[in-house]
């Protein structure tokens, strides 16, 4: 699509029946997708007619979600003086390996802490049970 939109043009499309968003300076008509969005329509209506780059990236959408945007592309954003600055820069690499590596590293560390904490709790429980058994009077 070679159409160019200004922020003012995009801002006019801010209802459930006519919904445009800007993601990384690309304009998408997501009207037909509103009812299908896994996060619900409220999430999309909150960013209707606006630059939703930051909200889109904060959620950490999958590659499939990014691919689903392609057929909804209607043009590009034509920046003008006085327009708000983009809130989130375009990631230098959208490669799944780069994104997954960071998330996986954190996930493994988190699991390690949980497992070690569970083992420490179990060991403390066993120790206290043994101490209670040793100090209990015989009947």
Curated annotation (Swiss-Prot):
Gene3D superfamilies the record matches: Cytochrome b5-like heme/steroid binding domain
Residue ranges occupied by any Cytochrome b5 heme-binding domain in the UniProt entry: 2-78
One GO term of the biological process aspect: sterol biosynthetic process
Segments passing through the bilayer: 105-125
GO CC terms, sorted: endoplasmic reticulum membrane; intracellular membrane-bounded organelle
Pfam families on file: Cyt-b5
InterPro entries linked to this entry: Cyt_B5-like_heme/steroid-bd (IPR001199), Cyt_B5-like_heme/steroid_sf (IPR036400), Cyt_B5_heme-BS (IPR018506), Cytochrome_b5 (IPR050668)
Protein name: Probable cytochrome b5
